[in-house]
Amino acid sequence: MNQPAAPAQIRIDFVSDVSCPWCAIGLNALQQALGKLDGEVHADIHLQPFELNPRLPAGGEDATEHLMRKYGSSAQEVEANREMLRERGNSVGFSFDLERRSRIYNTFDAHRLLHWA
């Protein structure tokens, strides 16, 4: 009698900033893809910290102004990217309320808290 093959074991280092919406989308998409493998793969996901904006001042910055300055985008391009983010998030079951988020902050302390939690 044939025994079912043991699932392949893989380690995935997922590098992410806790405030990055694209990272949240990527993690959800990864978890969904792994779920579709129906036990063929056992993935051990290790979350690795990364600061997208380590030089932000303590009070943070207006999110739209920050994105315009960082990427050289217009306000219209920032809004178009937000809409793309909403759509992609919805496609993997993750919804964003980007109208309410008005500031972006340095995440060093958040990463430190997660490390010690």
For each feature predicted by the language model, list its residue ranges.
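Extreme N-terminus of proteins, especially the signal/transit-peptide cleavage junction
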Residues: 1-10, 38
